[in-house]
Amino acid sequence: MEIVASLIKLFFGSKADKDRKQIEPYLQKIKAVYPSIEALSNDELRDRSEALKKQIADFIARDEADIVELKAKLELPETSLEEKERISKQIDETTKRIDEKIEEKLDEILPEAFAIMKDTARRFAQNDEVVVTANDFDRDLAAEKDFVRIEGDKAIYANHWMAGGNDLKWDMIHYDVQPVSYTHLRAH
Protein backbone atom coordinates (compact mmCIF):
# COMPACT_ATOMS: atom_id res chain seq x y z
CA MET A 1 0.00 0.00 0.00
CA GLU A 2 2.91 2.33 0.74
CA ILE A 3 4.18 1.81 -2.81
CA VAL A 4 0.86 3.00 -4.25
CA ALA A 5 0.86 6.04 -1.96
CA SER A 6 4.43 6.83 -2.99
CA LEU A 7 3.56 6.56 -6.68
CA ILE A 8 0.53 8.81 -6.26
CA LYS A 9 2.65 11.37 -4.43
CA LEU A 10 5.34 11.13 -7.12
CA PHE A 11 2.92 11.84 -9.97
CA PHE A 12 0.44 14.18 -8.30
CA GLY A 13 2.43 15.73 -5.45
CA SER A 14 1.67 15.72 -1.77
CA LYS A 15 -1.09 17.63 -0.01
CA ALA A 16 1.57 19.96 1.41
CA ASP A 17 2.89 20.65 -2.11
CA LYS A 18 -0.61 21.50 -3.31
CA ASP A 19 -1.20 23.75 -0.30
CA ARG A 20 2.12 25.54 -0.92
CA LYS A 21 1.23 26.13 -4.57
CA GLN A 22 -2.13 27.54 -3.50
CA ILE A 23 -0.68 30.06 -1.05
CA GLU A 24 2.44 31.05 -2.98
CA PRO A 25 0.66 33.86 -4.89
CA TYR A 26 -0.53 35.35 -1.58
CA LEU A 27 2.96 35.17 -0.11
CA GLN A 28 4.49 36.89 -3.14
CA LYS A 29 1.87 39.67 -2.97
CA ILE A 30 2.49 40.15 0.76
CA LYS A 31 6.23 40.38 0.18
CA ALA A 32 5.65 42.88 -2.63
CA VAL A 33 3.41 45.21 -0.60
CA TYR A 34 5.23 44.93 2.74
CA PRO A 35 8.01 47.48 2.06
CA SER A 36 5.46 50.20 1.25
CA ILE A 37 3.52 49.38 4.43
CA GLU A 38 6.70 49.34 6.53
CA ALA A 39 7.56 52.85 5.28
CA LEU A 40 4.29 54.37 6.55
CA SER A 41 4.00 56.46 9.70
CA ASN A 42 1.83 55.07 12.50
CA ASP A 43 -1.03 57.36 11.48
CA GLU A 44 -0.66 56.42 7.81
CA LEU A 45 -0.69 52.75 8.77
CA ARG A 46 -3.91 53.29 10.68
CA ASP A 47 -5.37 55.16 7.70
CA ARG A 48 -4.52 52.25 5.37
CA SER A 49 -6.30 49.86 7.71
CA GLU A 50 -9.37 52.11 7.75
CA ALA A 51 -9.24 52.33 3.94
CA LEU A 52 -9.46 48.53 3.73
CA LYS A 53 -12.51 48.53 6.01
CA LYS A 54 -14.07 51.21 3.81
CA GLN A 55 -13.41 49.15 0.67
CA ILE A 56 -15.38 46.29 2.17
CA ALA A 57 -18.19 48.57 3.35
CA ASP A 58 -18.42 50.26 -0.05
CA PHE A 59 -18.40 46.90 -1.85
CA ILE A 60 -21.49 45.70 0.04
CA ALA A 61 -23.24 49.05 0.62
CA ARG A 62 -25.87 48.65 -2.11
CA ASP A 63 -26.81 45.18 -0.90
CA GLU A 64 -27.05 46.37 2.71
CA ALA A 65 -29.26 49.26 1.62
CA ASP A 66 -31.46 46.77 -0.25
CA ILE A 67 -31.87 44.73 2.93
CA VAL A 68 -32.92 47.83 4.89
CA GLU A 69 -35.55 48.60 2.22
CA LEU A 70 -36.78 45.02 2.16
CA LYS A 71 -37.07 44.88 5.95
CA ALA A 72 -39.07 48.11 5.91
CA LYS A 73 -41.48 46.54 3.39
CA LEU A 74 -41.81 43.51 5.66
CA GLU A 75 -43.06 45.73 8.47
CA LEU A 76 -45.79 47.41 6.45
CA PRO A 77 -49.25 46.30 7.59
CA GLU A 78 -50.51 46.05 4.00
CA THR A 79 -47.81 43.56 3.01
CA SER A 80 -49.48 40.21 2.35
CA LEU A 81 -48.20 36.95 3.77
CA GLU A 82 -47.14 35.78 0.30
CA GLU A 83 -45.26 39.03 -0.25
CA LYS A 84 -43.59 38.70 3.17
CA GLU A 85 -42.36 35.23 2.24
CA ARG A 86 -41.00 36.52 -1.07
CA ILE A 87 -39.31 39.46 0.68
CA SER A 88 -37.83 37.17 3.35
CA LYS A 89 -36.39 34.98 0.61
CA GLN A 90 -34.89 38.08 -1.07
CA ILE A 91 -33.35 39.12 2.25
CA ASP A 92 -31.80 35.66 2.67
CA GLU A 93 -30.43 35.70 -0.89
CA THR A 94 -29.04 39.21 -0.45
CA THR A 95 -27.45 38.26 2.88
CA LYS A 96 -25.79 35.29 1.18
CA ARG A 97 -24.58 37.56 -1.63
CA ILE A 98 -23.12 39.96 0.96
CA ASP A 99 -21.21 37.09 2.59
CA GLU A 100 -19.86 36.00 -0.80
CA LYS A 101 -18.86 39.57 -1.67
CA ILE A 102 -17.10 39.99 1.68
CA GLU A 103 -15.13 36.78 1.04
CA GLU A 104 -14.25 38.01 -2.46
CA LYS A 105 -13.05 41.37 -1.14
CA LEU A 106 -11.13 39.77 1.74
CA ASP A 107 -9.30 37.54 -0.75
CA GLU A 108 -8.44 40.64 -2.77
CA ILE A 109 -7.14 42.69 0.17
CA LEU A 110 -5.51 39.81 2.09
CA PRO A 111 -1.92 40.66 1.12
CA GLU A 112 -2.21 44.29 2.20
CA ALA A 113 -4.23 43.44 5.32
CA PHE A 114 -1.67 40.86 6.40
CA ALA A 115 1.20 43.26 5.70
CA ILE A 116 -0.54 45.87 7.89
CA MET A 117 -1.05 43.34 10.68
CA LYS A 118 2.54 42.12 10.46
CA ASP A 119 4.01 45.61 10.51
CA THR A 120 1.78 46.70 13.39
CA ALA A 121 3.08 43.70 15.35
CA ARG A 122 6.65 44.63 14.40
CA ARG A 123 6.16 48.17 15.67
CA PHE A 124 4.88 46.92 19.02
CA ALA A 125 7.64 44.32 19.31
CA GLN A 126 10.40 46.84 18.57
CA ASN A 127 9.08 49.84 20.52
CA ASP A 128 7.94 50.25 24.12
CA GLU A 129 5.27 52.68 22.91
CA VAL A 130 3.45 53.32 19.65
CA VAL A 131 2.15 56.88 19.24
CA VAL A 132 -0.75 57.88 16.98
CA THR A 133 -3.03 60.87 16.63
CA ALA A 134 -5.84 60.24 19.11
CA ASN A 135 -9.34 59.52 17.87
CA ASP A 136 -12.58 58.71 19.70
CA PHE A 137 -11.77 54.99 19.79
CA ASP A 138 -8.43 55.73 21.49
CA ARG A 139 -10.09 58.02 24.03
CA ASP A 140 -12.76 55.43 24.86
CA LEU A 141 -10.14 52.71 25.19
CA ALA A 142 -7.90 54.89 27.37
CA ALA A 143 -10.82 55.41 29.76
CA GLU A 144 -11.00 51.64 30.34
CA LYS A 145 -7.53 50.17 29.73
CA ASP A 146 -4.12 50.93 31.19
CA PHE A 147 -2.08 50.10 28.07
CA VAL A 148 -3.20 53.28 26.29
CA ARG A 149 -3.07 56.86 27.50
CA ILE A 150 -3.94 60.19 25.95
CA GLU A 151 -1.52 63.11 26.03
CA GLY A 152 -2.82 66.15 24.20
CA ASP A 153 -3.83 65.04 20.73
CA LYS A 154 -1.76 61.83 20.88
CA ALA A 155 -2.72 58.32 21.92
CA ILE A 156 0.20 56.36 23.32
CA TYR A 157 -0.08 52.58 23.25
CA ALA A 158 2.25 50.58 25.49
CA ASN A 159 3.58 47.26 24.25
CA HIS A 160 2.90 45.65 27.62
CA TRP A 161 -0.15 45.15 29.83
CA MET A 162 -1.26 43.39 32.99
CA ALA A 163 -3.05 40.06 32.66
CA GLY A 164 -3.72 37.78 35.61
CA GLY A 165 -1.31 39.78 37.75
CA ASN A 166 1.51 39.36 35.24
CA ASP A 167 3.10 42.07 33.12
CA LEU A 168 2.99 40.75 29.56
CA LYS A 169 4.99 42.27 26.72
CA TRP A 170 4.23 42.06 23.00
CA ASP A 171 7.21 40.38 21.36
CA MET A 172 5.78 38.59 18.35
CA ILE A 173 6.11 39.43 14.67
CA HIS A 174 3.94 37.31 12.39
CA TYR A 175 5.58 34.91 9.97
CA ASP A 176 4.90 35.33 6.26
CA VAL A 177 3.44 31.83 6.16
CA GLN A 178 0.64 32.61 8.62
CA PRO A 179 -1.80 33.45 5.81
CA VAL A 180 -1.54 29.73 5.08
CA SER A 181 -4.12 29.15 7.81
CA TYR A 182 -6.54 31.58 6.20
CA THR A 183 -6.14 30.26 2.67
CA HIS A 184 -6.23 26.65 3.86
CA LEU A 185 -9.42 27.20 5.85
CA ARG A 186 -11.03 29.04 2.92
CA ALA A 187 -10.25 26.16 0.57
CA HIS A 188 -11.80 23.53 2.81
Language-model features: locations:
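Conserved small/polar residues in nucleotide/adenosyl-binding loops
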Residues: 183-188
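Helicase-associated low-complexity/disordered flanking segments
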Residues: 1-177
